[in-house]
Amino acid sequence: MFRPAIQKLSSLILMAVFCVVMTIISYNSQLDYKKPHYDKKVQAANYMFESLKVLRREYKDIPMPIKSQADQSNNANVTDLNDIESKRSFSSLDPLETGLVFYQDGLPGNPSSKLTTLNPNFAALVVDLMIEAGVKVPEERKRKPKVAVAFSSSFPGANLAVLSACKTLDVEPVVITSLSGSNYGAIDYDQFSWLDMEKKLIDSKIFPSTYKSKAVSIGRGNDSGIGLDSLTIKAIKGAINKHDIDFIYNEKEIEMEYYIDKRMETYFNRNDNAPYDLFINVGGGHASIGASNEIRNSPGFLSLEYLDEIYKDNTDDCAMFRFSQKESTPAINIIDIEKLVEDSVPIINLSDKKFKIDWSSNKWINLDEGSQLWRSEYNKSGILFLERKYNFWVVIPCLLASLLVVLSVGIYSHFQIKRRMTSYEPDSI
């Protein structure tokens, strides 16, 4: 019995197989295209990796109390220097083995947020944010931007990322640090505070001396240590006294306005009273971003329009309020880390063993690493640096070939039927 080609099982199977093959070829034709400023983001990630390695070595060389591993959870700030071991080991709370994660009973803190910012790729994310905020790369500008920065010891990783991004983009940061921190941050005030880390990096020529914090405060409630116990405040003051740095503190002043005034005074004195191009906040310091839930739930680049809308009915005084409303300076808010990173950087948990840092490597990323940046689905490194697209010169021919095969069989079958109908053969009916 007569059957046109399009009704034959063999023809249908061959067409289906051909189309599936074309689909597979198209799917596997993906190419990696470098995202804008690829080189800068790679450079920033490598700077951060280098700084992490320096601090890791420094941490391992710091003597530790024999019982401190067990006692650390009771009090991270008290050290018996008469009873020490020669080397420190890495805490189970520090799965990346950075030496920058510390714990003290009674302090709040989200370990995932702190660990996630210790990924060197976080510096590449900060480069993206700064460029989004209007900071141009050195090759595209006529003057060096000035950036006001507020650091917190809660996020040593984010602090390193900001410094690495500033170095990459050749930006001059004016930094003020709140030395108190939350759990899983840089809260070993006696031996390895953020100021100690900062000094080590500058002494090691990782960052220029101009990147040193221009002033420091205790932080916490009203930026003056409210809510901290006396031993912790004593440890913080001791850590500050080891360094030649302006200390924003007055025992007679407990009002927030005083500490905000002093911060703004420092920022502008250190910049010859010139305006800033950007304000970058790290952490949840009250003097920096106030107590507004809207700001605390708004990570990333905050445009002037966005800040104007937030502060329209909100006069919560803080550095961010003054920069945006009085100086017309936009901001980057590095807070609520899980919301900030979205899918660009993996969230690292205490129990997660998938993400690792190869401390033996000379660089975190090589410029010519290309598709290897997708080496781990969990790492998701490629998302920040590369964009995967289907190869136009493969996909279109495959599509046209599939259409051509189907149309050819259809047209051929049409003429088969037409010839059969005009032949007047009974078997054709």
Report residues per predicted region.
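C-terminal functional extensions of proteins
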Residues: L278, G285-I429
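Solvent-exposed loop/turn segments at secondary-structure junctions
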Residues: S153-G157, S180-Y184, D223, G285-S288, ...
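Membrane-embedded segments
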Residues: N121-A124, M130-F192
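Short, compositionally biased "basic patch" segments
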Residues: V20, I24-P120, A124, Q416-R419
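A substrate-binding/cap region within the structured catalytic cores of diverse enzymes
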Residues: D190-F279
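Structural motif
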Residues: A148-A150, L278-V282
